[in-house]
């Protein structure tokens, strides 16, 4: 907590948390090689077209690479046309809204975030909690809370498609780096576990009770 003029306490509490009892998965021995995921609405601010364009550059070097986009929204038709334009029908999949993404996340190698703007991204929290490293634009305001650059993922310059390409390619090529980022992702996610979040709420309510 922080105090303004030593009077008003301010607490920063995440909008989501992870279950401390959840199982975690190593990046080794995943059943589907080179599967990447992205969780978010099919809307302009998410810039999923950047990810589709990225795939057009990566597939020649990684012919088994897949990108699964989970979400819904008005840009779906546009994205389908873009996928067809790049002949990526066997590589990019618009999966729509899925209630339980646990299995999908557990079988992924990399998560992508290419938004213009973000809050506290619950999708990224879910992926790092399961050991899936994320490559994200340096978007205001949420990703930097969840991703420590070069430790559990990559945070790259906003809208820098070339840097996006090289960062993702590096992760796909280097299994040791993926494993390192995977372990650090699980570790970093524990900051947002249910106990820590609930304890902060308890502190807030106790402070309110004292000041009433």
Spans of model-derived segments:
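Donor nucleotide-sugar binding/catalytic pocket of nucleotide-sugar-dependent glycosyltransferases
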Residues: 1-23
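Conserved donor-binding/catalytic core segment of Leloir-type glycosyltransferases
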Residues: 28-46, 52-55, 68
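A conserved nucleotide-sugar
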Residues: 48-93, 173-177, 212
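Aromatic "clamp/platform" in nucleotide-sugar-dependent glycosyltransferases that forms part
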Residues: 97, 116
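Short hydrophobic beta-strand element within catalytic cores of glycosyltransferases
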Residues: 133-137
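Conserved acidic donor-binding segment of nucleotide-sugar-dependent glycosyltransferases
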Residues: 149-150, 154-161, 170-176
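A short, well-ordered alpha-helix in the C-terminal region of glycosyltransferases
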Residues: 163, 170, 177-191, 203
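C-terminal alpha-helical cap of glycosyltransferases
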Residues: 194-212
């Amino acid at each position: 907590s922080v105090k303004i003029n030593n009077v008003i306490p301010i607490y920063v509490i995440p909008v989501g948390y992870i279950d401390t009892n959840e199982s975690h998965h190593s990046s080794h021995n995943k059943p589907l090689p080179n599967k990447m995921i992205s969780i978010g609405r099919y809307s302009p601010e998410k810039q999923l077209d950047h990810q589709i364009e990225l795939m057009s550059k990566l597939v020649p070097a990684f012919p088994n690479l897949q990108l699964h986009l989970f979400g819904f929204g008005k840009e779906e038709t546009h994205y389908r046309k873009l996928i067809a334009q790049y002949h990526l029908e066997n590589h990019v999949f618009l999966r729509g809204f899925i209630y339980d993404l646990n299995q999908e996340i557990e079988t992924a190698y990399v998560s992508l975030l290419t938004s213009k703007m973000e809050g506290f991204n619950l999708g990224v929290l879910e992926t790092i909690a399961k050991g899936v490293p994320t490559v994200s634009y340096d978007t205001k305001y949420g990703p930097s809370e969840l991703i420590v650059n070069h430790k559990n993922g990559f945070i790259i310059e906003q809208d820098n498609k070339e840097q996006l390409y090289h960062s993702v390619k590096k992760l796909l090529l280097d299994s040791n780096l993926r494993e390192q980022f995977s372990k650090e992702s699980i570790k970093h996610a524990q900051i947002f576990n249910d106990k820590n979040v609930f304890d902060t709420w308890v502190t807030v309510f106790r402070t309110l009770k004292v000041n009433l």
